[in-house]
Amino acid sequence: MDRLLSVVVSVYNEEKALEDFYKETTGILKDIDWAYELIFVNDGSSDQSLAILERLSASDRAVKVVSFSRNFGHEAAMIAGLDYSSGDGIICMDADLQHPPECIP
């Protein structure tokens, strides 16, 4: 049975960074020896972040989206993502690429 890595990603008004984050992160994750899930937590974004996340989720079954009705803050978003994750290992990241995906392996 494959080990599962959960990557929990806090998102707040990151429409400009989401596509790049997704491409860079999945590119890295596909090369590791674990199955993975990307759990994006939309923290009440007012831009197009949620629409982008829903599109990514529709095209990639490894992408899961949790969405808050309003901004509850970074810590609440991370806790929700941790609660939703089912991995044997968990990594927390921000969607703004502050944490380079290259650090995952």
Where are the model-predicted features located?
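Structured catalytic core of nucleotide-sugar glycosyltransferases
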Residues: 1-105
